[in-house]
Amino acid sequence: MMSSRTRKIYLFVFMFISTSLQLMNGEAKAEPETFRQFLYNKQKGTVLGRTGTSWCQITVFYIIFYIFLSAFFIGCLAIFLKTLDPKVPRFYGKGTIIGVNPGVGYQPWLKENPDSTLIKFNLQDSKSWEPYVKQLDGYFSRYNNTNDTRECGAEDSNEALQTDPDSLPCRFDLGLFEKANCGAKDQYGFKSGKPCVVVSLNRLIGWRPVDYDGNSVPEEIKSRYKSGSITINCEGATPFDKEHLGKVKYIPEAGIDGRYYPYVFLPSYQQPIAMVKFDTIPRNKLVIVECRAYASNIEHDVSTRIGMVYFELFVEDKKPVAAPAA
């Protein structure tokens, strides 16, 4: 069997003889092509190394190739989109980024100052509390559209929304807030110095409150707790705040009505809420308020503020300072 070294010797001899024969026959060695000739070679009729026919062939090839590639991509995308439900995330619940513990939010929250949790106004200056009233007007305006909703009695709920595509969500009644002087006609209590704050839960697909078992109801809500509801409890964040917060009224007293759950992604869905009225909030003192939502499946963590929300109340009662003359 021929070794590798022997093959290399034979190859060298063959190349040497071939080169010698070319020189003996007067054949000149081909000159290297210059860059200018590469761009355009007049003798060969090429541009960038290709003739016109070659350029046409490769252009047609890539057009057909990318058409098929695009069609394949669009087909795969269409098949993937068919597997998605526009109303429900593919993954939700425990172990997902959405999670199972709803967050707590509040209104009014001024969009002009989104990083601030301070609700501050002066009783003697209507311009200071009007922005909060307008914010709440805009927030409640979403409940004015009652199309594709239904009136629900005490025994009705949104339970069928997940299984029956023809079921309509329950219409949320704002009348209980008006009766408690926390409606638009009372400027949500801001004009009288008894501000009403909306407390709500974040929308979690499929989430519903779980009742406490027997004697497991927390002591702070035991007198107001009602089966099927998410009870809201607000108190001062520090001993100073607890001392000065004053009387707090909850509307409704049991908190957010659980029959409006579970939440589903429908344009006509009306989110259930509760309002907290601060009847005797002190004047000219800053009070930090902590509001918690209570149900058996709502956890609380002060460090991450899970299941709770914080905001500050500062109600002034003094003559506004006149702006200096220009």
From Swiss-Prot:
Organism encoding this protein: Caenorhabditis briggsae
Give the multimer and partner information.
The sodium/potassium-transporting ATPase is composed of a catalytic alpha subunit, an auxiliary non-catalytic beta subunit and an additional regulatory subunit.
Has the keyword Cell membrane been applied to this entry?
yes
Q: Which PROSITE patterns match?
A: ATPASE_NA_K_BETA_1
Where are the coiled-coil regions? none
Cytoplasmic membrane side: 1-59
Lumenal side, ranges = 81-326
Q: Which Gene3D superfamilies match?
A: Na, k-atpase alpha subunit
Tell me where in or outside the cell this protein is found.
Cell membrane
Similarity comment: family membership: Belongs to the X(+)/potassium ATPases subunit beta family.
Q: What is this protein called?
A: Probable sodium/potassium-transporting ATPase subunit beta-3
The alphabetized UniProt keywords are:
Cell membrane, Disulfide bond, Glycoprotein, Ion transport, Membrane, Potassium, Potassium transport, Signal-anchor, Sodium, Sodium transport, Sodium/potassium transport, Transmembrane, Transmembrane helix, Transport
The biological process GO terms on file are: intracellular potassium ion homeostasis; intracellular sodium ion homeostasis; potassium ion import across plasma membrane; sodium ion export across plasma membrane
* Residues carrying a glycan: 144, 147
Q: What domain of life does the UniProt record list for this protein's source?
A: Eukaryota
PANTHER family for the chain? NA_K-ATPASE BETA SUBUNIT ISOFORM 4-RELATED, SODIUM/POTASSIUM-DEPENDENT ATPASE BETA SUBUNIT
Q: List the disulfide bonds.
A: 234-291
